[in-house]
């Protein structure tokens, strides 16, 4: 399985439910498994001051809040839940340089804390690792070549040493493609190629106005084209979950009517 996030967890659960008892190899650049949801008392801190901080200050504050919560037997997950409603504002109030630092150094660690899985599924992943039925590899896939009934994977590990695996099948669990220029959807390629649209901040998704209207290559807003969901990640960051999608869909419907 290529990728170690939520899609990987779903894939492993599906394989186990279908009776697969062989070894599962999971490969990703950071080899980080999603962390579990937790039950317990909610954290009672005010996250609003985070909005005035830079990236380094925010990360330090969150670690301190999580540590303080732990002294009262409050799970760190509740701290993350407190900042959940501020997701888009937290992204938009970072400087461009801090956003770039986040994408380069923080995002993988953020994702496993922010996008979590059910505790029983997390326990299942740990048990599979413990019994060596799930092996986690930190590396970057380079080639995948079919050889008879098998697929031979060639990768580069964290120390840039070659890593080879021979498997029966490969599952792409890398999730949503965020890089605009790497998107293979013909419509999106045409929008970008013709200048009707342009890549969003940091080359992620499509550039949009605050109301979701598409922005073209010249910076002109096109209100007749409304953008929703993962294509707005560059502008909003939090743009995948149901609450955000519901709000964007309502705004698009209002614009259309």
Language-model segment annotations:
Residues 1-56, 60-257:
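Flavin (primarily FAD) cofactor-binding/catalytic cores of flavoenzymes
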């Amino acid at each position: 399985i290529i990728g170690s996030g939520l899609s990987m967890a779903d894939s492993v659960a599906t394989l186990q439910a279908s009776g697969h008892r062989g070894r599962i190899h999971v490969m990703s650049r950071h080899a980080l498994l999603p962390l579990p949801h937790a039950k317990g008392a909610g954290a009672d801190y005010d996250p609003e001051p985070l909005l005035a901080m830079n990236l380094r200050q925010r990360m330090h504050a969150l670690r301190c809040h999580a540590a303080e919560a732990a002294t009262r037997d409050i799970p760190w997950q509740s701290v993350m839940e407190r900042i959940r409603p501020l997701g888009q504002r937290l992204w938009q109030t970072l400087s461009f340089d801090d956003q770039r630092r986040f994408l380069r150094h923080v995002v993988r660690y953020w994702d496993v804390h922010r996008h979590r899985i059910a505790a029983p599924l997390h326990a299942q992943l740990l048990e599979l690792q413990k019994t060596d039925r799930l092996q986690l590899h930190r590396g970057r896939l380079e080639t995948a070549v079919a050889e008879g009934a098998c697929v031979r994977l060639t990768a580069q590990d964290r120390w840039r040493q070659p890593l080879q695996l021979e498997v029966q099948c490969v599952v792409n669990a890398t999730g949503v493609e965020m890089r605009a220029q790497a998107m293979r959807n013909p419509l999106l390629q045409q929008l970008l190629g013709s200048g009707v649209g342009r890549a969003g901040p940091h080359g992620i998704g499509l550039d949009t106005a605050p109301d979701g209207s598409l922005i073209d290559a010249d910076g002109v807003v096109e209100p007749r084209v409304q953008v929703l969901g993962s294509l707005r990640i560059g502008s909003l960051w939090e743009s995948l979950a149901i609450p955000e999608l519901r709000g964007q869909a309502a705004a698009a419907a209002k614009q259309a009517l």
